[in-house]
């Protein structure tokens, strides 16, 4: 008995057999470095756990002949085999012809964790990795591979094998290693012979000077000669030759024919040798037959199959019948049959089943169908088997069973024993429907099929969507602790998809849904991740269809800049906005022009725009922008003066001149060079043009004398009176001096009163007068020694003049001087003025300084005890608008509360008991006694306070009347009474106002409430809320008398007052009006909407009465102001009020007409109005044009009017597109879907009517293709319109578009073929005209190909509609033609690589490319075309894809060079080489050498039409001299072909079911499924 001391070791005395089964020869050199000659079915499978009931196997034989031999003693173990030597692919591995060896030590252990691959324990990828690779491995390699480092100290030296078993240490270590964790390193390995690295290699994988001892060498045989003389490795020969061939050879060489004769002799010898070694025996391969066995014999046979020591040749004699399908796999699992032997059984059963199907069939088609059906049924059985194992999760030995089932299924898959399409479809469906608990199991299996599944788009895209769906489902549950590992694993898979299989994430229908999810899986800090994601996002964006109108109306750069301008009013951040504007628009001239237009347009309001523009221009001037040139250019080219307030533009320039930012001398030089021009006004003779008119607006106060003289000279040349400007300034100064005699010296003058309207005076005049006023105020304040240098009246007058001028910068200087006064009224007025002009002064940068100055004056007056409540109120209101001054406002409120509490706690005076009886508002001493009472510092009781309030409210009701106190003073006294008892005062005022509302003879509420609002006792908002509350209850109680009159009172309360005097109370009321309009625009619109119906003729006489006669006109102006102030909110409100509000619609139309510069009284036809509105739209007027069109569309208009509007809109769309504008899109969005569809269809008709290529382009004698350039530009316009209106395309698509697109692509392909032929014919010519013609053609080709691809994307749905039964063939033909055209054009290799350029609508190569020309970075046009093809293939049926593949292979010879291009294989796969082409059903196709007669996809013929040799040559020209590829490129599909008379009969169909080893009991010479005679195989003799 041989001791089993080295389980798993190689028998040292066992000779290795060669391939020919020649056991008599013991050539051991074949055991080393033998190449892998086994089939894929014999590849390595990891060792599987032994079933608990299975006995241990000790037999180490590998064949039937060796199984009968006795086992010699085991060889001594060799220690310290390093990991490198065992992992080395050149390490010796025994070659076998049967099944792999499985040792008992491994059979008793659990599956190895395969830690050397660095994969987690749960990954099945390592278990089938050897199946995927081409290297051969055995189970012994799996034992050797996990070895670790060299042990620190070697174990004791082992005893000889014949003296007993080795030390217990080795056996115990081996046992422990097999039972321990899989990651633990094995300490010892069996002895293996190593080939020295320096040994020279010989032919036949032999090694020289190296013969390892195997026990039966000749020197081991003891004979008499060996004992006496020793052993010699070569036979001794005598030193002298017995005979020589020299004489005979010399005699032959002397003749001329000697060499030829010798050559013939040697050739005859070689031929005989070749014929002798050639295998001529026919193939004797037959699948092993199946026999019927009893159950016991069947179980015994299966147990023998599970035993690796039983050779397969012996088992092949008695394969039991009745084991098939899922039952076969269950038997393999229950018996733990090794995977490679289980696959052998599957092949045997499958081969017999398929042959049985062939015997039943009568025709070729029926046989193929039966075989396919059987394979699909078998695949279903495998799926059921795997589902059963997965469903048993959690049971005993589930992990081992899952490992076996996964390994066996993967082996079947990679052996091509399954229907891959069906298997992958089931796999993806199962993964998609799996619960989150089972997803990890499917992910482990996914690692096995990862590369195979992502080889084709059909599976890769669906896998990507399934993984993204599972990740979305995981993140939605919000269980970070439990699902975080799963989410990380899914993210890792998705990231690997993005980085390695980017094209699988081209998702035409779900990109927007999964975009953020994909982004979350990447590390955007990594350059690779960011670059690939940007490219992926761009590729997806180019094949997306706009799903809504908002997608089609994206904001342009001009609109973004305008939005930034509008945001300054709220943010007040000039620095960041300046940088943002420069970054948003690269064209600096356009940026400056847009800023000037924004500041002057009538569709915006506010004086702050002037100072915003001035500050931005100063910032840009510092940044290096040439604002002088751009401003002058704007003035010389401005045309739409009706919608621009040019006074604002001149104001901006005057501010720039004051700050020396604008160069006056440069402007004068430009004007001299240009010449002063006049512009006809049509009525009043001639006026100066806008650029020359600036000459009259320039302030000259700080300019040198020679510049002033030059300006006067140019004014004289322009016909402008020079004396008129100086006289106007003199008259203004004189008039102001008369009104302010204390500040300015009054001179005797006969000058009349000058109108201070800013439209009547130039900025040269206003600037001169304003600076004179500022200088006078400053001088007056410095010279005076009085407490208050300015009186309130003087301050009001100065403020009124500067406000009429609109010169806020000078006003800010005057306010800064007025802060030094000690008059509370002036300081309160200064605070109110800053608050009123808050936006403009903030843009100037003076708001914070003025507020701090006012706070300083407040502190000064507080210390002196001369503080007034008016000043405190105004200062607090101003501080509330400054976010940085919240602390100061808090202190001011504390002081105000302290004052009010002090007044409330003061004791009433004893004299006040008699006051109510003696107080009378008619009394002359009423005001004096009231001021004495308020200033005495004593308190007031409620009765006294009530008497005073009653007297003051009576004065307020009568409007002053006979009382000595005015209504404004009465309201001021009411405000002074508030600190004594605020609650009582508010109650009295509420009762007073409520009494007025109930009174039928109440006065006009605007006269009563204006002063109350001015002093702060009542607010407009609180009064409106009170009226609304009472109106809600008035329906039942009648609380308000004459509510219609009250509505008009409220509206009149919001209108600007006519009085010109602006004292403190009036000015505060204006401030309150401004605040209400800004904060409550919706309430204002409701007030206007309620009051407008009362303007009708029925109510006019009764309601207006003594009111303002211009109330309707003022209402229109108020509504226009609201539209300009808050356009977005007001426009939205107006859109909602269009239906059912005829009166409001009428007033709104007038306000919009005023904004648009139209005449409200002009009664034009709706169609004419619509045409005029459409043509005047721009970046600023767009929302108002939309509103005007909406008003027109709501009017009763017939179909003729609507059709006319559609015509006008289409013309406007073409005009705007030509001008690079997109305003028309917003106007079309107001129209219904039908109108947008009509406009789009007109654009499509015009697009398809444009000639793609003119005849002049085909003539190489012409220098350029100017006509083509114009056609390209026209096509661009129509394509832009189609893209913008893509939302009007129905979901079902437009069925008339696909045929047009297919025909256009065919025409494009035909032109490309003709151009290639012409290029080949004139290749020798290198004239300039030829080069330009080629470039023009390629430029046109790039555009039309890109444009047609875009239309295909937009109308993709039309290709996907399932056709009717009668048109199914035509639809399939169109789909195939479309794919063929796209692939052939994208495949074309043009001289200038035009198809590799960026497919942007606004980028095309120059006519003559510069020397340093480089393509624009981005997505290549070729890549974009393939992405479009991928999006089509996703929705096309498989039949269209298969027809496209068949067509390109059979009828497109140039495409044969690119069949193995990974991109096309990815798109059109899976493509089976065994599929019989349609042309082979009747006759064999031509060989590649005979491609001249093969038909090609010319556009004129359909896929089933006729073809010509000329067309073939044309198609072959696509890849002619410019392809750069060899014509003899070998294809994978053509490597196995049957040659018959020089013709190829097609690829030989290799059947994986017949790739069986050990199929026959006796090994024959030609025992192979593929007959060796077909390949002229020869015997290889060692």
UniProtKB/Swiss-Prot annotation:
Q: Provide this UniProt record's keywords sorted from A to Z.
A: Activator, Nucleus, Repressor, Transcription, Transcription regulation
Where it mainly occurs, coarsely classed, is nucleus
Can you provide one Gene Ontology molecular function annotated for this UniProt record? transcription coregulator activity
> Is-annotated flag, keyword Nucleus?
yes
In which compartments does the protein localize? Nucleus
Q: Give the Low complexity compositional bias ranges.
A: 1479-1493
Tell me the segments the record calls region Disordered: 1-114, 146-189, 1479-1512
Q: Which domain of life is it from?
A: Eukaryota
Give me the stretches of Polar residues compositional bias. 83-100, 1499-1512
Summarize the subunit comment. Component of the srb8-11 complex, which itself associates with the Mediator complex.
- This one is known as Mediator of RNA polymerase II transcription subunit 12
Q: What organism does the UniProt record list as the source?
A: Emericella nidulans (strain FGSC A4 / ATCC 38163 / CBS 112.46 / NRRL 194 / M139) (Aspergillus nidulans)
* Lineage of origin: Eukaryota, Fungi, Dikarya, Ascomycota, Pezizomycotina
């Amino acid at each position: 008995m041989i001791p089993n001391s080295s389980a798993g070791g190689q028998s040292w005395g066992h000779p290795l057999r060669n391939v020919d089964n020649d056991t008599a020869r013991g050539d051991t050199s074949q055991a080393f470095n033998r190449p892998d000659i086994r089939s894929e079915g014999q590849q390595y499978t990891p060792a599987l756990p032994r079933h608990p009931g299975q006995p241990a196997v000790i037999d180490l034989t590998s064949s039937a002949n060796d199984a009968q031999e006795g086992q010699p003693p085991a060889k001594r173990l060799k220690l310290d085999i390093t990991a490198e030597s065992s992992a080395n692919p050149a390490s010796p591995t025994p070659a076998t012809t049967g099944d792999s060896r499985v040792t008992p030590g491994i059979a008793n252990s659990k599956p190895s964790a395969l830690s050397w691959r660095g994969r987690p324990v749960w990954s099945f990828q390592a278990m089938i990795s050897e199946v995927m690779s081409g290297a051969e491995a055995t189970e012994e390699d799996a034992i050797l591979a996990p070895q670790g480092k060299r042990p620190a100290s070697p174990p004791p030296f082992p005893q000889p094998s014949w003296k007993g078993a080795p030390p217990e240490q080795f056996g115990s270590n081996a046992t422990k290693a097999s039972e321990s964790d899989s990651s633990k390193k094995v300490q010892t390995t069996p002895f293996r012979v190593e080939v020295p690295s320096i040994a020279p290699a010989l032919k036949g994988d032999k090694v020289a000077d190296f013969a390892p001892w195997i026990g039966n060498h000749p020197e081991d045989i003891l004979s008499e000669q060996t004992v006496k003389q020793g052993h010699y490795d070569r036979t001794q020969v005598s030193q002298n030759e017995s005979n020589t061939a020299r004489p005979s050879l010399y005699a032959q060489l002397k003749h001329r024919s000697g060499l030829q004769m010798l050559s013939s002799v040697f050739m005859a010898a070689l031929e005989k040798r070749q014929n002798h070694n050639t295998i001529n025996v026919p193939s004797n391969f037959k699948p092993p037959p199946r026999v019927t066995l009893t159950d016991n014999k069947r179980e015994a046979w299966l147990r023998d199959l599970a035993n690796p020591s039983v050779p397969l040749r012996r088992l092949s004699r008695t394969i039991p019948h009745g084991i098939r399908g899922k039952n076969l796999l269950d038997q393999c699992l229950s018996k733990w049959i090794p995977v490679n032997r289980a696959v052998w059984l599957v092949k045997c059963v499958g081969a017999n089943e398929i042959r049985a199907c062939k015997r039943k069939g009568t025709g070729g088609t029926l046989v193929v169908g039966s075989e396919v059906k059987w394979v699909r049924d078998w695949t279903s059985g495998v799926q059921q088997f795997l589902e059963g194992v997965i469903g048993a999760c959690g049971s005993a030995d589930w992990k081992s069973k899952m490992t076996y089932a996964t390994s066996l299924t993967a082996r079947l898959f990679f052996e091509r024993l399954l229907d891959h399409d069906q298997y992958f479809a089931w796999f993806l469906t199962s993964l998609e429907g799996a619960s989150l608990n089972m997803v990890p199991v499917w992910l482990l299996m996914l690692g096995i099929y990862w590369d195979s599944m992502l080889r084709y788009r059909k599976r890769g895209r669906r896998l990507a969507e399934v993984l993204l769906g599972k990740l979305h489902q995981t993140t939605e549950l919000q269980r970070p602790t439990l699902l975080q590992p799963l989410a990380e694993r899914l993210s890792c898979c998705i990231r690997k998809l993005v980085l390695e299989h980017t094209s699988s994430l081209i998702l035409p229908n779900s990109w927007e849904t999964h975009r953020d999810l994909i982004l979350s899986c990447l590390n955007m800090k990594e350059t690779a991740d960011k670059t690939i994601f940007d490219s992926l996002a761009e590729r997806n964006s180019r094949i997306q269809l706009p799903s809504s109108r908002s997608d089609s109306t994206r904001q342009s750069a001009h609109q973004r800049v305008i939005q930034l301008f509008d945001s300054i009013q709220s943010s007040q951040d000039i620095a960041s906005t300046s940088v943002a504007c420069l970054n948003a628009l690269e064209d600096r001239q356009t940026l400056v022009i847009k800023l000037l237009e924004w500041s002057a347009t009538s569709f915006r309001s506010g004086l702050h725009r002037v100072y915003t523009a001035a500050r931005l221009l100063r910032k840009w001037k510092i940044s290096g922008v040439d604002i002088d040139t751009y401003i002058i250019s704007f003035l010389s080219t401005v045309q739409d003066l009706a919608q621009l307030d040019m006074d604002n533009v001149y104001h901006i320039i005057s501010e720039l001149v004051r700050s020396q930012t604008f160069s006056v001398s440069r402007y004068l030089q430009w004007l001299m060079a240009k010449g002063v021009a006049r512009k006809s006004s049509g009525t009043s003779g001639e006026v100066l043009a806008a650029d020359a008119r600036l000459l009259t607006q320039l302030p000259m106060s700080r300019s040198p004398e020679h510049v002033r003289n030059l300006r006067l000279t140019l004014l004289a040349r322009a016909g402008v009176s020079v004396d008129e400007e100086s006289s106007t300034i003199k008259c203004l100064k004189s008039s102001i001096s008369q009104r302010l005699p204390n500040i300015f010296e009054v001179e005797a003058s006969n000058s009349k009163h000058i109108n201070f309207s800013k439209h009547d005076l130039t900025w040269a005049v206003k600037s001169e007068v304003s600076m004179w006023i500022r200088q006078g105020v400053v001088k007056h304040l410095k010279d005076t020694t009085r407490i208050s240098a300015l009186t309130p009246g003087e301050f009001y007058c100065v403020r009124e003049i500067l406000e009429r001028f609109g010169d806020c910068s000078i006003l800010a200087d005057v306010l800064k001087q007025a802060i030094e006064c000690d008059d509370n009224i002036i300081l309160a007025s200064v605070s109110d003025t800053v608050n009123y002009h808050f936006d403009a002064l903030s843009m100037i940068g003076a708001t914070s300084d003025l507020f701090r100055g006012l706070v300083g004056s407040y502190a000064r007056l507080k210390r002196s005890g001369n503080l007034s409540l008016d000043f405190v109120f105004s200062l607090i209101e101003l501080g509330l608008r400054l976010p940085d001054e919240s602390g100061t406002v808090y202190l001011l409120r504390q002081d105000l509360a302290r004052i009010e509490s002090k007044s409330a706690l003061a004791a009433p005076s004893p004299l006040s008991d008699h006051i109510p009886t003696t107080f009378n508002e008619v009394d002359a001493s009423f005001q004096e006694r009231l001021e004495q009472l308020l200033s005495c510092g004593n308190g007031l009781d409620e009765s006294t306070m009530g008497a005073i309030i009653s007297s003051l409210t009576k004065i307020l009701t009568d409007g002053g009347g006979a009382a000595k106190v005015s209504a404004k003073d009465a309201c001021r006294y009411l405000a002074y009474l508030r600190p004594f008892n605020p609650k009582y005062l508010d109650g009295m005022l509420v009762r007073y106002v409520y009494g007025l509302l109930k009174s039928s003879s109440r006065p006009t509420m605007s006269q009563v409430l204006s002063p109350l609002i001015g002093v702060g006792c009542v607010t407009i908002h609180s009064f409106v809320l009170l009226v609304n509350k009472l109106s809600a209850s008035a329906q039942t109680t009648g609380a308000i008398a004459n509510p219609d009159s009250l509505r008009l009172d409220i509206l009149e309360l919001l209108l600007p007052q006519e009085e010109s005097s602006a004292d403190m109370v009036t000015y505060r009321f204006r401030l309150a009006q401004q605040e209400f309009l800004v904060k409550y625009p919706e309430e204002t619109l409701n007030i206007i909407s309620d009051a407008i119906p009362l303007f009708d003729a029925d109510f006019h006489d009764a309601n207006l009465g003594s009111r303002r006669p211009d109330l309707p006109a003022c209402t229109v102006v108020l509504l226009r102001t609201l539209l300009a102030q808050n356009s977005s909110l007001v426009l939205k409100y107006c859109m909602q009020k269009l239906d059912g509000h005829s009166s409001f619609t009428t007033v709104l139309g007038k306000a919009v007409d005023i904004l648009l510069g139209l005449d409200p009284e002009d009664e034009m036809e709706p169609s004419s109005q619509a045409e005029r509105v459409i043509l005047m739209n721009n970046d600023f007027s767009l929302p108002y044009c939309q509103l005007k069109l909406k008003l027109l569309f709501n009017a009763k208009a017939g179909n003729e009017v609507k059709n006319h509007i559609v015509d006008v809109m289409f013309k406007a769309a073409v005009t705007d597109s030509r001008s690079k504008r997109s305003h028309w899109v917003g106007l079309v969005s107001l129209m219904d879907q039908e109108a947008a569809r009509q406009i789009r269809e007109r654009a499509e008709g015009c697009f398809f009517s444009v000639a793609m290529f003119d005849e002049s382009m085909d003539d190489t004698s012409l220098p350029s293709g100017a006509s083509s350039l114009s056609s390209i530009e026209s096509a661009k316009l129509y394509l832009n319109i189609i893209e913008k209106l893509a939302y009007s395309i129905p979901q079902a698509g437009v069925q008339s578009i696909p045929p047009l697109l297919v025909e256009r692509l065919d025409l494009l392909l035909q032109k490309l073929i003709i151009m290639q032929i012409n290029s080949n014919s004139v290749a020798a010519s290198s004239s300039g005209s030829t080069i330009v013609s080629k470039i023009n053609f390629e430029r046109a080709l790039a555009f039309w190909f890109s444009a047609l691809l875009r239309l295909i994307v937009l109308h993709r749905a039309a290709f996907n509609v399932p056709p009717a039964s009668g048109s199914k063939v035509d639809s399939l033909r169109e789909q195939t033609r479309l794919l063929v055209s796209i692939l052939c054009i994208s495949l074309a290799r043009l001289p200038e690589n035009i198809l590799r350029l960026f497919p942007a609508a606004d980028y095309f190569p120059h006519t003559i490319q510069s020397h340093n020309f480089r393509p624009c970075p981005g997505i290549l046009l070729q890549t974009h075309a393939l992405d479009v093809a991928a999006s089509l293939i996703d929705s096309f049926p498989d039949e269209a894809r298969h027809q496209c593949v068949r067509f390109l292979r059979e009828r497109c010879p140039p495409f044969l060079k690119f069949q193995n291009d990974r991109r096309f294989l990815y798109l059109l796969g899976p493509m089976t080489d065994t599929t019989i082409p349609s042309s082979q059903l009747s006759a064999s196709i031509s060989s590649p050498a005979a491609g001249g007669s093969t038909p090609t996809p010319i556009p004129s013929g359909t896929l089933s039409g006729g073809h010509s040799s000329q067309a073939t040559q044309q198609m072959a020209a696509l890849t002619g001299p410019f392809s750069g590829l060899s014509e003899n490129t070998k294809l994978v599909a053509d490597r196995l072909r049957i040659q018959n008379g020089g013709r190829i009969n097609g690829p030989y169909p290799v059947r994986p079911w017949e790739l069986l080893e050990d199929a026959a009991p006796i090994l024959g010479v030609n025992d192979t499924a593929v007959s060796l005679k077909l390949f002229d195989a020869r015997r290889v003799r060692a």
